[in-house]
Amino acid sequence: MKLDAKSTIETGKAILGIEFGSTRIKAVLIDQENKPIAQGSHTWENQLVDGLWTYSIDAIWNGLQDCYSDLRSNVKELYGIEIETLAAIGISAMMHGYMAFNKEQEILVPFRTWRNTNTCLLYTSPSPR
């Protein structure tokens, strides 16, 4: 039996997707047929820190919280309900970026993004002989 969007959310069958893009963090709820039923977003901008383009860990967490809050507001506006349970969550992040953590889950270096070109010197410099 196919559920309508409101019932999908109410019964905890909605799936949350989050994407950390280079200019926005986006969240979307989809139904069991992969149809978008609600969305939220947060605009952000990376910063040049010590010669590297990055996002602070605080910006990451604050952006995620704001994006999810925007999604919750969208659900409330469209369906008059709150999100209580989800069937699944998927998270993706911008291509060519990474975050390194230790076993205590502490960040080891600032978030490196696709905008960093510092390693290109390895490919443009003459090889040692």
Ranges and model annotations:
Residues 112:
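Surface "functional belts" at beta-alpha junctions
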Residues 123-129:
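Conserved small/polar residues in nucleotide/adenosyl-binding loops
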Residues 116:
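Carbohydrate-associated surface elements
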Residues 1-109:
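N-terminal glycine/serine-rich phosphate-binding loop of ATP-dependent small-molecule kinases
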